């Protein structure tokens, strides 16, 4: 009996754990250490800084099952998903890693043992083929002479991508940095499947399938292209869980493995179909995995960046559900079966289940409101299409008006043998939106300008002053030996009391000084393991190895500490009031206020906001001790400490406890007792995305000042109403009632005026071919009354065409009315549009009533004068 996907995942991790590897949890799909990356798309992403030498771990061997998404950006598999056997938006990457420990011999030996040993995967050795980089004689020799793979099944792959080291078998992190050859292992499905071995003209067939890639990082590529040997070569491997499961379960398509068969059955049940061969089922089964895990990791549907990629995937799934006959929201119903089939890999998703389901349902229902209309428009455009390509302007209109991502439009077109002019779509988007929605905010890693090998000890938990030594200086991203007055720079010290921005807490400000030298620290940032003091030298000359007094702005730090501690109290209070589904989605803590984003699907009620505020202030009055303990990460979790999912934590973590009320993992600076916070006030509560709410609040003196401002405003209002703050509500209600009564009276007077105006105007109508025509400009008439006047005039005149215009505050208002007996010849919408374009405007409406506006008041008389000839031509 073949292993299940869950058993294969666990077997991989167990094997490498038995070889001395640390089992590391999957990191978030949102990379927290690489702003150039849209989504985590490989197992090595969370170890990038380790490979670059910017981060150190307590272990030198690691193994993971990493959740990955490839949709959008460089790795965009979206259009192929569901139509091929192996393309996915979401997949799991099994990997083992060596950070300067073992290298090629052990990496290859481990891979062969796991794949072929009867105790593990027990694959037939004769079914396995291997590729190596053309000049990697070492790897070739290990496979041939030590492992015993026949040389005819070891294929050398050279530079097949147009340049030196540009090869399927040479891996590079970027244009510079760690790189090296790789060896790939392929499984031969047999002669009954079309395709040739790797490197052959028929290699794209499905017979030989790559199942494992072993990367040997042994070089450091320089700017000039030279390859320098790394002092400690490393290993990074990746094996797609879905691919190896297909091999071990003896099926040729990933969609036939147990995991996908379960999901496809769930999709069929949700949409009410029995045809399990329909490719739309595969599309939806894939998409629920990426969408659910992305939302669980904090991404919400939006029109920007990651949120827009998520929206595209959800809407593609919704459209395929529509094709299968789904009439109601169904996608969210797949979260529960997904959690069940993913098993231990879905623990975090299970905690967020209700939030994920609600976000999916809201997005699907929102799209459903425009899906049918958009598809009808697309059908109409395709019917009238000349050629085989839909123009970019139409694709953009579908996106802009009906929310159709361009790849969804491309899907529909492809099903009918058509293409989409995607370049034209991008041009239309740029011209009409003036911004690119799918890439903004990514692509520039400013921290990469500064590479610091040092580790800066932080001593700022205990003090805000420290004598230290300058160990590095950076000016314009380059290391320098000295800086002069006026230079902006980053200063690295051998130790510092300055807190580097992280965990939502802003970096410290202050001063570095010695005799005749002053460096104003405007911000503090982390550069790998180093803490950088960002600012400007205002006096003297600062050199590497100089001693300085590092002085944090302690008053500013104190305000930040209070706000940060209040954030923890707020988090715990929200979970009490709203439920344990509340999880932190982001935060900002500075010296003025705190901002806290959290998972919740609806706006908080005023009484809930008050309840949260009261709970936090009650904990402040309890004056709880704020205690910090350093312990193993597993011990902290066992103690119940809340962690921010996706955040990277060391093996030992700081656990912050506030009495019996709050316990969280946190590396920030805090009050010593909750009473130090003094006062907590919520300033605002709002939504930032589907399923994410935001609270802004303030503490201490800032909160007191906010209360004083509110009190002052109430006193000012009371004086204006000639009352006091005690009866202010009654006074305001009385004023509003009086205002509404006067407004009603005014509208009645205006209606009477309009009726009188209509009576006087009816006598000014002329006649064309038996039809009354009334065209006139009115002065000092409320534009809102024009519609009433037109209705009155139509009743008075009988068969008639009416155009009224008025100008007020530099704007033209136009209205056209046509009695129903004439709308087959004269349409009010066309008529008012004809007039509006002459006054710099546009408008439209029904055939019998239409309105428009314009900006050229001076052109109004001439525009109205042109109406008679236009109407005459129609009659």
Curated annotation (Swiss-Prot):
It is an enzyme of class 6 (ligase). Its EC number is 6.1.1.7. Keywords: Aminoacyl-tRNA synthetase, ATP-binding, Cytoplasm, Ligase, Metal-binding, Nucleotide-binding, Protein biosynthesis, RNA-binding, tRNA-binding, Zinc. SUPFAM superfamilies: Class II aaRS and biotin synthetases, Putative anticodon-binding domain of alanyl-tRNA synthetase (AlaRS), ThrRS/AlaRS common domain, Translation proteins. One of its GO terms (biological process) is alanyl-tRNA aminoacylation. One of its GO terms (molecular function) is alanine-tRNA ligase activity. It is found in: Cytoplasm. Its cofactor is Zn(2+). GO terms for cellular component: cytosol. Gene3D superfamilies: 2.40.30.130, 3.10.310.40, 3.30.54.20, 6.10.250.550, Bira Bifunctional Protein, Domain 2 (3.30.930.10), Threonyl-trna Synthetase, Chain A, domain 2 (3.30.980.10). Pfam families: DHHA1 (PF02272), tRNA-synt_2c (PF01411), tRNA_SAD (PF07973). Binds 1 zinc ion per subunit. Zn(2+) binds at residues 564, 568, 666, 670. Consists of three domains; the N-terminal catalytic domain, the editing domain and the C-terminal C-Ala domain. The editing domain removes incorrectly charged amino acids, while the C-Ala domain, along with tRNA(Ala), serves as a bridge to cooperatively bring together the editing and aminoacylation centers thus stimulating deacylation of misacylated tRNAs. Homotetramer. Catalyzes the attachment of alanine to tRNA(Ala) in a two-step reaction: alanine is first activated by ATP to form Ala-AMP and then transferred to the acceptor end of tRNA(Ala). Also edits incorrectly charged Ser-tRNA(Ala) and Gly-tRNA(Ala) via its editing domain. PANTHER family: ALANINE--TRNA LIGASE, CYTOPLASMIC, ALANYL-TRNA SYNTHETASE. HAMAP family: Ala_tRNA_synth_B (MF_00036_B). This is Alanine--tRNA ligase.
């Amino acid at each position: 009996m073949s292993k299940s996907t869950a058993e294969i995942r666990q077997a991989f991790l167990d094997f490498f754990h038995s070889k001395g590897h640390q089992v590391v949890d999957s990191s978030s799909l949102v990379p927290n250490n690489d702003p150039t990356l849209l989504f985590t798309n490989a197992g090595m992403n969370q170890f990038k800084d380790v490979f670059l030498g910017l981060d150190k771990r307590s272990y030198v061997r690691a193994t993971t099952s990493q959740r990955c998404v490839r949709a959008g950006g460089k790795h965009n598999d979206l259009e192929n998903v569901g139509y091929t056997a192996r393309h996915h938006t979401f997949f799991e990457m099994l990997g083992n890693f060596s950070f300067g420990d073992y290298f090629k011999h052990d990496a290859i030996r481990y891979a062969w043992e796991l794949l072929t040993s009867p105790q593990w995967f027990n694959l037939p050795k004769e079914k396995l083929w291997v590729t190596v980089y053309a000049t990697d004689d070492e790897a070739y020799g290990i496979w041939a002479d030590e492992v015993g793979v026949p040389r005819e099944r070891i294929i050398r792959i050279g530079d097949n991508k147009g340049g030196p080291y540009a090869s399927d078998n040479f891996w590079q992190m970027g244009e510079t940095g760690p790189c090296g050859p790789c060896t790939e292992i392929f499984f031969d499905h047999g002669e009954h499947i079309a395709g040739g071995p790797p490197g052959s003209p028929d290699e794209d067939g499905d017979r030989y399938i790559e199942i494992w890639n072993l990367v040997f990082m042994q070089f450091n590529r320089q700017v000039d292209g030279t390859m320098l040997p790394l002092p400690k070569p490393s290993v990074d491997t990746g094996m797609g869980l879905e691919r190896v499961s297909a091999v071990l379960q003896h099926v040729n398509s990933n969609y036939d493995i147990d995991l996908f068969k379960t999901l496809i059955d769930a999709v069929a049940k949700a949409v009410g179909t029995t045809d399990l061969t329909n490719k739309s089922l595969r599309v939806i089964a894939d998409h629920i995995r990426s969408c659910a895990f992305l939302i669980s990791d904090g991404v919400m549907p939006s029109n920007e960046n990651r949120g827009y990629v998520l929206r595209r995937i959800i809407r593609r799934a919704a459209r395929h559900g529509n094709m299968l006959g789904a009439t109601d929201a169904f996608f969210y119903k797949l979260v529960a079966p997904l959690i069940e089939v993913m098993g231990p890999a879905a623990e975090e998703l299970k905690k967020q289940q209700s939030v994920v389901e609600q976000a999916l349902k809201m997005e699907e229902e929102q799209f459903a409101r425009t899906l049918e209309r958009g598809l009808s428009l697309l059908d109409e455009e395709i019917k009238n299409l000349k050629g085989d390509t839909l123009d970019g302007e139409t694709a953009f209109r579908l996106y802009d008006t009906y929310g159709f991502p361009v790849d969804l439009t491309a899907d529909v077109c492809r099903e009918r043998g058509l293409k989409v002019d995607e370049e034209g779509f991008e041009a239309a988007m740029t011209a009409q939106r003036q911004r690119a929605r799918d890439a903004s905010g990514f692509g520039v890693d400013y921290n990469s300008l500064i590479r610091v090998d040092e580790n800066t000890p932080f001593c700022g938990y205990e003090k805000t002053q420290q004598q230290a030594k300058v160990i590095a200086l950076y000016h314009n991203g380059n290391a320098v030996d000295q800086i002069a007055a006026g230079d902006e720079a980053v200063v690295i010290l051998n130790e510092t009391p300055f807190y580097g921005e992280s965990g939502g807490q802003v970096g410290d400000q202050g001063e570095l000084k010695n005799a005749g030298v002053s460096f104003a620290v405007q911000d503090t940032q982390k550069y790998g393991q180093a803490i950088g003091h960002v600012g400007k030298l205002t006096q003297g000359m600062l050199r590497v190895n100089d001693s300085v007094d590092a002085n944090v702005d302690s008053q500013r730090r104190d305000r930040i500490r209070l706000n940060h501690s209040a954030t923890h109290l707020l988090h715990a209070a929200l979970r009490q009031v709203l439920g344990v589904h509340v999880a932190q989605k982001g935060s900002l803590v500075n010296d003025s206020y705190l901002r806290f984003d959290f998972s919740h699907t609806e706006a908080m009620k005023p009484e809930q906001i008050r309840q949260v505020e009261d709970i936090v202030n009650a904990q402040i009055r309890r004056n709880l001790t704020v205690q910090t303990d350093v312990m193993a990460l597993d011990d902290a979790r066992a103690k119940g400490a809340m962690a921010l999912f996706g955040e990277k934590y060391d093996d030992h973590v700081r656990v912050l406890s506030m009495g019996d009320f709050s316990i969280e993992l946190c590396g920030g600076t805090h009050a010593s007792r909750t009473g130090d916070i003094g006062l907590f006030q919520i300033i605002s509560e709002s939504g930032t995305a589907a399923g994410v709410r935001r609270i802004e609040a303030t503490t201490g003196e800032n909160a007191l000042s906010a209360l004083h401002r509110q009190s002052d405003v109430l006193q000012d209002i009371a004086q204006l109403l000639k009352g006091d703050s005690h009866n202010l509500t009654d006074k305001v209600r009385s004023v509003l009632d009086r205002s509404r009564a006067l407004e009603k009276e005014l509208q009645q007077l205006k209606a009477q005026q309009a009726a009188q105006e209509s009576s006087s105007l009816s006598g000014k109508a002329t006649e064309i071919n038996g039809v009354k025509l009334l065209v006139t400009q009115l002065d000092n008439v409320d534009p809102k009354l024009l519609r009433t006047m037109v209705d009155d005039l139509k009743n008075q005149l009988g068969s008639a065409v009416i155009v009224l215009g008025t100008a007020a505050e530099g704007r033209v208002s136009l209205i056209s009315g046509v009695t129903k007996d004439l709308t087959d010849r004269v349409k009010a919408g066309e008529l008012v549009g004809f007039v509006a374009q002459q006054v710099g405007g546009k408008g439209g409406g029904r055939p019998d009533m239409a309105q428009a506006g314009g900006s050229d008041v001076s052109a109004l008389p001439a525009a109205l004068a042109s109406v008679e000839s236009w109407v005459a031509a129609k009659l």
